[in-house]
């Protein structure tokens, strides 16, 4: 597969280049020259494959890696992700079942596997991260199809946190490729410049991030937003966006461009105080223990459903175990860290 960048669609780059550098010579993010597309029969066929094979098939398209399901299983284990029913029509995808309790471990291992390394050394590139997120979604949808909670005729919503916008963007790419994804609900913490853009069509580019207890979301301007602007509005709009960022100006979109940019998305803001309340209330009502980031995502999903009346199935993506945030979760629960760890083991 050949790649272009979000700032230059004239020059082509190899898949190998996307694995060794985060950005092209122009500073833009790598993106496929032509995004692969899957029909309904291809999506239905996911049901007959295990998670590892689903992941391998997608990574082979992006990188010609010649992986099979056994390679993926050997790299990340046979059951690195689990789908849990949390409440009515809300399923949780736990993508962190590994020794580190962190999706990043899975990304490192698979990145090394793609590169042909026996060990997961080195830092995964930006496109490696993105492609593995996409491949993971295909693996998860294979499981959802087997469970009978998703099909090609009934989309399922996705709930994630904003962060650097990689998670919402991966869901967008996966939907573009043919997965039956409905709306992509992404939640910000107090750092909500993207919410301003999606709701008001304007965004300050000179903001300084506010420190919270969800630091991965403490981002003033999410880097991967550039990807969405490129995909939805084109390279010329990326240039206008970058000019605003370079000069610390307000970035504005007219009504038509705004409608195009946010099509299929819902943006929410969930404060630190509310995040803690969500952790406490969800455990009280369903005995499911959320980590701080998945609590942000679930709070946004609640806002989306209450505002739209939408009641179809939703998949909440979690990338780290609550045990990784013992103090924050314990505080939200009103218990000691030791008690929280015991509940984590029980779950």
Outline where the language-model segments fall:
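PLP-dependent amino-acid enzyme catalytic core
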Residues: 1-347
